[in-house]
């Protein structure tokens, strides 16, 4: 394919020298040097022709003055496994801090690790088959797998589907709600926990808890169902947790198949700045989660865009595939640790 692209560019009057080819789990990036720098302005104009001619969704990226790259989708997507020999070193070398999360592999085939402290609340959206639940399990399993014994987190989980988070029911210090009524009760309890922590901080004269203070993680598997079942009554609890949780070590991880305005309200969106967009059904859904189109063009099965707080551009990732046996291993490591 790269030779065909090089030949087509030459026929279009843009001779290039191929610098390198990077094969990532969900795409191939081919980097070129221009023979003549004045041809750079022409390249972007010709990419649409290349895409149509090759029947590929080719993305043009300008980098250095006389250098550019073209990104093509892979013919055969590669899954990134949670426990994978190729990326196993991540748990031994890269995940060195408590709350480090292996979010996936980027377009340069680089494993990307981020800390929950830098993205204290996370909003995940994706349609059926997009990998939404897998990404949610990946985040939970990373937190379990990498937890330090002296400051292991506690959990509040809301699973109105009753089965998605059922494997975590035997975790120590983990409450799971399976009905809307239980969910409201647990979220109200988390808000009391917030007040208690703030009272402790006030009495000690501190504005933010230390990094080694144990965290509480609130996981909502499907916000859409919960908002519908409670007629939006849970919104005030979610917003309060998002507004006050960061300073006192309470984190919120919310997922939904329905990233519409009545589910991801303005107040919720304004207070959860880290977003993970997997494949969604429309540009409208993409705009509600990311602020622009793009997520509707993702391929599903873990293909995602990660928007970090205070960062303008998203990171394109292939998230790890987490199996039931991976979840069991992570739980055992957490309990045994």
Locate each region found by the language model.
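Acidic/charged, solvent-exposed loop-and-adjacent secondary-structure segments enriched in E/D, K/R, S/T
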Residues: 23
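Short, charged/polar, Gly/Pro-enriched secondary-structure boundary elements
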Residues: 74-82
């Amino acid at each position: 394919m790269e030779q065909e692209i090089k030949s087509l560019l030459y026929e279009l009057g843009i001779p290039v020298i191929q610098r390198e080819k990077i094969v990532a789990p969900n795409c191939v990036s081919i980097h070129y040097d221009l023979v003549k720098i004045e041809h750079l302005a022409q390249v972007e104009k010709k990419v649409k022709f290349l895409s149509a001619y090759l029947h590929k969704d080719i993305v043009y990226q300008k980098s250095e003055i006389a250098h550019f790259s073209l990104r093509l989708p892979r013919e055969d997507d590669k899954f990134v496994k949670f426990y994978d020999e190729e990326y196993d070193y991540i748990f031994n070398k890269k995940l060195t801090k408590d709350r480090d999360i292996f979010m996936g592999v980027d377009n340069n085939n680089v494993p990307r690790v981020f800390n929950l402290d830098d993205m204290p609340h996370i909003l995940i959206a994706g349609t059926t088959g997009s990998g939404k639940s897998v990404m949610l399990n990946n985040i939970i399993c990373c937190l379990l797998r990498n937890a330090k014994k002296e400051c292991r987190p506690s959990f509040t989980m809301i699973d109105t589907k009753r089965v998605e988070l059922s494997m975590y029911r035997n975790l120590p210090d983990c409450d799971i709600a399976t009905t809307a009524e239980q969910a409201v009760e647990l979220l109200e309890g988390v808000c009391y926990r917030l007040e208690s922590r703030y009272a402790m901080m006030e009495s000690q004269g501190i504005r933010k808890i230390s990094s080694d203070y144990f965290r509480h993680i609130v996981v909502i598997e499907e916000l859409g169902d919960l908002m519908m079942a409670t007629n939006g009554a849970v919104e005030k609890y979610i917003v309060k947790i998002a507004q006050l949780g960061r300073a006192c070590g309470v984190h919120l991880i919310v997922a939904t198949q329905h990233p519409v305005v009545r589910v991801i309200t303005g107040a919720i969106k304004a207070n959860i700045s880290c977003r993970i967009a997997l494949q969604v059904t429309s540009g409208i859904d993409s705009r509600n989660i990311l602020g622009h189109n793009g997520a509707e063009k993702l391929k599903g099965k873990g293909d995602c865009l990660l928007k970090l707080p205070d960062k303008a551009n998203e990171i394109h990732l292939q998230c790890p595939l987490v199996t039931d046996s991976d979840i069991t291993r992570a739980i055992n490591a957490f309990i045994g640790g």
